[in-house]
């Protein structure tokens, strides 16, 4: 099915959050490193919602509304400080971070504000110890170019990253403070994007600009992309956490499909005069002898119940696919899971199945007075959870009669999305008065403009000229995740051909990944040590592959240890000569018989023994010399 | 053009629209944009401004709660001196509005409903750093009034900077048969992470106890787990910003309070109330008392300055066990010869002054300097003000190192440090 995106009125906006690679955090002087070792300690905090939101007069509602949530924060004495623990006022913002953010703004043709204010954005999910995120609006009204047209950049903000969630311990959520405060730029586009491909291209372009500064962090989790997607008659959906460029295109495609299908279902429901019955039926008795493992486990729980709701006119539609592999029933299930914490639900479009018999389904339908065209949803769990789950289902089913509900959704690996939470209202923000306004002088802007970093197209030309890369390799390298590393390695190891470095980073790594090696374990240091060894003659270029495989298997080992493990211990020129002399002696009769024509045969024998330990060219030179001497 | 108006500003960087906000810099126009962010525009860059809509006067009133009195609960009066235990944020302008009625307090901290009947009143609006003896007197008078009107306990909401001075002053000036609890917050009450709520709950829990005396309640540790009840004359703010900034000095806290379970665990004996609801105040304070920190190379002339200004008392914050350099001895003698009461404390804060150990101390005693035992300098300052306000100098010299309200403990606990 080919979708005409213009016809369906597709509008996409991107929101990109990129971590900056600064020496210190945005509002304190701690380093911007993440740790996986044991924290030095933990503290407990309770965050209470702000007073301004409440109009409750009822006593119980007031107490409930003001009840705080409990969080545990892990800290390190040497890399987190009192600021992250919300025990000390923030320090002045990192000037380095501010400069990088302004570079990005200028590269995207934006207008920088005269005076920037640090704001507090209320966040009480615990991801910030203070209960708010500090954020600074710096620029607006920019644009980038894509092959399908201009994309407006409506805002660029400099803000602090949130704390890392570690686990949910039941009565408290645990966060680690190492990530809290790492500077982020938040870039928002206008909803100018009209196709999935354009969305991917815009994201790629923004990524290129960010990397051009040379000051953004690399690695999983350092860039996060949220996508706002809407179609005519549909709704604005915010999809969070898209990490991969290719996934952007897929997510947009699948979201359009989902919304179109929800609209079709709505039309069908209306035609049937469908109705959601707002009553929860206790059908525990019907299922007390049920063979379903899920139901049996639920009934063993304290206050375990099976309950049902009746959706008149929904038959055949609950099981209808709205995204590849996901159905309307999955949407109901998502809501129930998120809101009530149940494991899932059953619906009559998929029954009898899962140990639930036709007889039980029949009794169920009779009990709730379901007709041919009706669907029934059942949930089994502890009673209070079941009730909340079915209330959520009722709510979502009513939304199905209207069309597409506005939601925040989570991106899945296959390009589908799942419900996360309602779309947030306007962020509640007020000034961070602990930090003075930032006056951004024209001279400062002009100084940055005069020193803007190189853009990809400029880099492309330079790579061809300076590093003698061909068009294809230069293009690949400019867009490569490893582009900065490439230049570092070329500068450090001038006796290594840039082409070799480029093909290793963009070719060899992909090959060994295909062979099953986990290249995510490779760090810059591994590649640096590899090329250093090559530069110093410790390994031949044929040995690079084995060394990198070794580092994948043993990331903590040193280069010498890897060479030992892989049997690639370096051979000196003298050693190579001896080995070659040995091989010649061993095959003296062949030499005598064939004369110089023995070269090919002997080269094969030499390389069989020396592969990876010595450069092929070196072996070739020595062998030819030895043959001439005879 | 007024704050709150919706304006459109034309600049060389495009058009900005938003709500006009107050600006601390007269060269900057500050507006709140639709996206919630504030932005500043230099006036020199403005081409044109027009008002799109007049702003509404913001209202900060919420419907009354109509709380009924619970006869089973004690009545606690919460008096504010200017600290904001509760506050409302106006997200439009960013202003934080202090609120201090019983309804406001209960709305902010509804847990109070289950603990006590609450009366709330602001008795002054003074930043803690602007506190002075005349305000201490007013607080004491207000306390007396509340108790006479039936309060079973008093909570004083106070800025943390000088809370320990006020706690000391009230300890000496007020003799009441109900607990008087000073409480504050290290994080402003507008933010979700504020310590104000737990501190206030704990203070009210302490205020309903059948005890008497003046105390301070603040966070016991960085985490939101428990609060300490500190004796008002044995507590000091020891950190500029941490939640657990307040420490008992040369003593351990009186009690540990769990605001979640409402449990109070006493760590030492306290004076019990006899239910008489008696209250007497003595607000006589001699204000001409100075606190001088001793340091190497100091010019003792500062002492003559105070003496010539007719100061009646001087607290020296000496080094070590209570020492001062010999080159200021002549100035100290000038003071004591003139009848000024000169007393010694230590800048180590912790530990007891003892001027018998070294010759320096012995010489100081010959000059008439009196050691203050284990009182922190701030407490000694306030005590000297109180004594000089009520007694002749000779009597003051006898009383300064005698315990009156718990300010001196004659046993030095190992675990107090």
Curated annotation (Swiss-Prot), chain A:
Enzyme class per UniProt: ligase
Source organism, top-level taxon: Archaea
Record flagged with keyword Nucleotide-binding: yes
Reaction catalyzed: L-glutamyl-tRNA(Gln) + L-glutamine + ATP + H2O = L-glutaminyl-tRNA(Gln) + L-glutamate + ADP + phosphate + H(+)
GO annotations of cellular component type: cytoplasm
A GO molecular function held by the record: aminoacyl-tRNA ligase activity
EC number(s) stated in the UniProt entry for this protein: 6.3.5.-
Alphabetized UniProt keyword annotations: ATP-binding, Ligase, Nucleotide-binding, Protein biosynthesis
Record GO biological process: glutaminyl-tRNAGln biosynthesis via transamidation; translation
SUPFAM superfamilies: GAD domain-like, GatB/YqeY motif, Glutamine synthetase/guanido kinase
Cited InterPro entries: Asn/Gln-tRNA_amidoTrfase_suB/E, Asn/Gln-tRNA_Trfase_suB/E_cat, Asn/Gln_amidotransferase, Asn/Gln_tRNA_amidoTrase-B-like, GAD-like_sf, GAD_dom, GatB_C_1, GatB_Yqey_C_2
Function according to Swiss-Prot or TrEMBL: Allows the formation of correctly charged Gln-tRNA(Gln) through the transamidation of misacylated Glu-tRNA(Gln) in organisms which lack glutaminyl-tRNA synthetase. The reaction takes place in the presence of glutamine and ATP through an activated gamma-phospho-Glu-tRNA(Gln). The GatDE system is specific for glutamate and does not act on aspartate.
PANTHER family for this protein: GLUTAMYL-TRNA GLN AMIDOTRANSFERASE SUBUNIT B MITOCHONDRIAL AND PROKARYOTIC PET112-RELATED, GLUTAMYL-TRNA(GLN) AMIDOTRANSFERASE SUBUNIT E
Subunit field text: Heterodimer of GatD and GatE.
Matching HAMAP family: GatE
Entry's family note: Belongs to the GatB/GatE family. GatE subfamily.
Name of protein: Glutamyl-tRNA(Gln) amidotransferase subunit E
Organism: Methanocaldococcus jannaschii (strain ATCC 43067 / DSM 2661 / JAL-1 / JCM 10045 / NBRC 100440)
Gene name of the record: gatE
UniProtKB/Swiss-Prot annotation, chain B:
Organism domain of life: Archaea
InterPro entries in the cross-refs: AsnA_fam, Asp/glu_Ase-like_sf, Asparaginase/glutaminase-like, Asparaginase/glutaminase_AS1, Asparaginase/glutaminase_AS2, Asparaginase_C, GatD, GatD_N
PROSITE patterns: ASN_GLN_ASE_1, ASN_GLN_ASE_2, ASN_GLN_ASE_3
One MF annotation (Gene Ontology) recorded for this entry: glutaminyl-tRNA synthase (glutamine-hydrolyzing) activity
Gene Ontology biological process terms from the UniProt entry: amino acid metabolic process; regulation of translational fidelity; translation
Reaction equation(s) it catalyzes: L-glutamyl-tRNA(Gln) + L-glutamine + ATP + H2O = L-glutaminyl-tRNA(Gln) + L-glutamate + ADP + phosphate + H(+)
Coiled-coil segments on the chain, per record: none
One Pfam family in the UniProt entry: Asparaginase
Annotated active site: 84, 160, 161, 237
EC number of the protein: 6.3.5.-
Keywords per UniProt: ATP-binding, Ligase, Nucleotide-binding, Protein biosynthesis
Enzyme class: ligase
Keyword Transcription part of the UniProt annotation: no
Asparaginase/glutaminase domain location: 74-403
Homology family: Belongs to the asparaginase 1 family. GatD subfamily.
Assembly and oligomerization: Heterodimer of GatD and GatE.
NCBIfam families the UniProt entry points to: asnASE_I (TIGR00519), gatD_arch (TIGR02153), PRK04183.1 (NF003217)
Function: Allows the formation of correctly charged Gln-tRNA(Gln) through the transamidation of misacylated Glu-tRNA(Gln) in organisms which lack glutaminyl-tRNA synthetase. The reaction takes place in the presence of glutamine and ATP through an activated gamma-phospho-Glu-tRNA(Gln). The GatDE system is specific for glutamate and does not act on aspartate.
Name by which UniProt lists this protein: Glutamyl-tRNA(Gln) amidotransferase subunit D
Origin species: Methanocaldococcus jannaschii (strain ATCC 43067 / DSM 2661 / JAL-1 / JCM 10045 / NBRC 100440) (Methanococcus jannaschii)
Gene from which the chain derives: gatD
